[in-house]
């Protein structure tokens, strides 16, 4: 099936009455304030792995259906994903029927979701999980299903009535900047008015940046997390592009991240087909450093034990979920090596050394301990543990010493430093 590009934007005009505009001006900075996502969201999202597969006759195990999500829910419990922290099961595009119902409400495709979304939400909740769903700010979703333009209130209430816990709100089919921004703000208010706690995942800056620089202070008022860059694909080139974009724009985005508000570099594709082992380690390590939502998109029925162990690595997850809530950043790039760091609670730090080369063998690299954590991480000394690609207790290092490591091509070594 040929999908409409997520970059496709058709005209949608949002006609807001003066009263609504006054309402926004009063409540704008408190529009979200939902107390959710105090640490980055963790879970599973169908899009990258299963896309918009609607053919349940030919591919019953891979089409977007309630069967797929119920199977994933079962595995998230039985295989330890929920206990590791992955507690959101998220539906992306292509779950809807082609038309709204007679009352103007969104409805699930009756053949692929015969029991409806409320039933699925109840099932997911019975497993101790939470359900995420997808909608779009414009006239249509990216795949051409009904959009939420003009129906923000009724859609928000529908999701609340169903028991939805997260909304991923896309930005296709809306090429008016005013419409785009107002639509995202209005949906935040509409979700709050339902009285239900619903994590709000936006793609606002992704669609805004081609027109002007996003106001991230504004965006963080309304969204729990937000996409900045292109969709991730199951390829190393895609991961590299996301990381390169992040380094270029980190001065804009790092400071606005924190409890309840996160930059989202998109899904984890670990356990699929396109990344080598070292590249999977790099994605896991850098997503932890970036305090990114950890939303896997893979097939939990077929995932390898090695990929599962990486995704469930409790030490790496602890860095990602650190309650201090500070996003990490790249602070050094020399030749083909990048060094990233992230401040953690209790004066700890995470440090990642990434090898940009894709040829040759492991690259030796030496770090001055005094340079880490803005000179504070190991002053006067610290205990260093290598967490990835394997856990190694390296011991106590004084501030005046050096740390030597070797990093595989396209790989990353992740350390934790504790005072």
UniProtKB/Swiss-Prot annotation:
**How is the activity of this protein regulated?**
Galactosylgalactosylglucosylceramidase activity is stimulated by saposin B and ammonium chloride.
**So what EC number does this one have?**
3.2.1.22
User: Which reaction equations make up its catalytic activity?
Assistant: Hydrolysis of terminal, non-reducing alpha-D-galactose residues in alpha-D-galactosides, including galactose oligosaccharides, galactomannans and galactolipids; a globoside Gb3Cer (d18:1(4E)) + H2O = a beta-D-Gal-(1->4)-beta-D-Glc-(1<->1)-Cer(d18:1(4E)) + D-galactose; a globoside Gb3Cer + H2O = a beta-D-galactosyl-(1->4)-beta-D-glucosyl-(1<->1)-ceramide + D-galactose
Q: Which residues are glycosylated?
A: 139, 192, 215
In-chain residues carrying the UniProt-annotated modification Phosphotyrosine: 186
Subcellular locations according to the entry: Lysosome
The residues responsible for catalysis, as annotated, are 170 (nucleophile), 231 (proton donor)
Is Iron-sulfur a UniProt keyword of this protein? no
**Disulfide-bonded cysteines:** 52-94, 56-63, 142-172, 202-223, 378-382
Q: Report a single Gene Ontology molecular function.
A: catalytic activity
Q: Which InterPro entries match?
A: Aldolase_TIM, Glyco_hydro_27, Glyco_hydro_27/36_CS, Glyco_hydro_b, Glycoside_hydrolase_SF, Melibiase/NAGA_C
- Identify the main location: other
Q: Which domain of life is it from?
A: Eukaryota
Example of a GO cellular component annotation carried by this entry:
cytoplasm
Q: Where is the signal peptide?
A: 1-31
Biological process (GO) annotations?
Answer: aorta development; glycosylceramide catabolic process; negative regulation of nitric oxide biosynthetic process; negative regulation of nitric-oxide synthase activity; oligosaccharide metabolic process
Key words, A-Z: Disulfide bond, Glycoprotein, Glycosidase, Hydrolase, Lipid metabolism, Lysosome, Phosphoprotein, Signal
SUPFAM superfamilies named in the record: (Trans)glycosidases, Glycosyl hydrolase domain
Instruction: Give binding positions for substrate.
Output: 203-207
Question: What quaternary arrangement does the UniProt entry report?
Answer: Homodimer.
Q: Which PANTHER family match?
A: ALPHA-GALACTOSIDASE A, ALPHA-GALACTOSIDASE/ALPHA-N-ACETYLGALACTOSAMINIDASE
**Functional summary from the UniProt entry:** Catalyzes the hydrolysis of glycosphingolipids and participates in their degradation in the lysosome.
Its recorded name reads: Alpha-galactosidase A
């Amino acid at each position: 099936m040929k999908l409409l590009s997520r970059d496709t934007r058709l005209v949608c005009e949002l006609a807001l009455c003066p009263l609504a505009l006054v309402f926004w001006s009063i409540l704008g900075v408190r529009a979200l304030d939902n107390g959710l996502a105090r640490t980055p969201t963790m879970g599973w999202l169908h899009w990258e792995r299963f896309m918009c597969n609607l053919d349940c006759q030919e591919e019953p195990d891979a089409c977007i259906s309630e069967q797929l999500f119920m199977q994933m829910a079962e595995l998230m419990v039985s295989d330890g994903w929920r206990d590791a922290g992955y507690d959101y099961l998220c539906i992306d595009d292509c779950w809807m029927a082609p038309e709204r119902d007679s009352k103007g409400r969104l409805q699930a495709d009756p053949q692929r979701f015969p029991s409806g979304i409320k039933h699925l939400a109840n099932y997911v909740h019975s497993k101790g999980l939470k359900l995420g769903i997808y909608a779009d700010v414009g006239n249509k979703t990216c795949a051409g299903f009904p959009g939420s333009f003009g129906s923000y209130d009724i859609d928000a209430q529908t999701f609340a009535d169903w028991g939805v816990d997260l909304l991923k709100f896309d930005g296709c089919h809306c090429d008016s900047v005013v419409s785009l921004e107002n639509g995202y703000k209005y949906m935040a208010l509409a979700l709050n008015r339902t009285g239900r706690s619903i994590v709000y995942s936006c793609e606002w800056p992704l669609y805004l940046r081609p027109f002007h620089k996003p106001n991230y202070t504004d965006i963080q008022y309304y969204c729990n997390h937000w996409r900045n860059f292109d969709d991730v694909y199951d390829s190393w080139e895609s991961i590299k592009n996301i990381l390169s974009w992040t380094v270029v724009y980190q001065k804009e985005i790092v400071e606005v991240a924190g409890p309840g508000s996160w930059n989202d570099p998109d899904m984890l594709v670990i356990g699929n087909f396109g990344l080598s082992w070292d590249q999977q380690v790099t994605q896991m390590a850098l997503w932890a450093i970036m305090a990114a939502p950890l939303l896997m998109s893979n097939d939990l029925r077929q995932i390898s034990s090695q990929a599962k162990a990486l995704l469930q690595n409790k030490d790496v997850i602890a860095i990602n979920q650190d309650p201090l809530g500070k996003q990490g950043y790249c602070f050094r790039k020399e030749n083909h090596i990048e060094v990233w760091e992230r401040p953690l609670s209790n004066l700890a730090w995470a440090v990642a050394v990434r090898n940009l080369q894709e040829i040759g063998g492991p690259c030796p690299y030496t770090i001055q301990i005094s340079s880490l954590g803005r000179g504070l991480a190991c002053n006067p000394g610290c205990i260093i543990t290598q967490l990835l690609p394997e856990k190694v207790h390296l011991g106590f290092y004084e501030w005046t010493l050096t740390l030597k490591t070797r990093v595989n091509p396209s790989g990353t070594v992740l350390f934790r430093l504790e005072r």
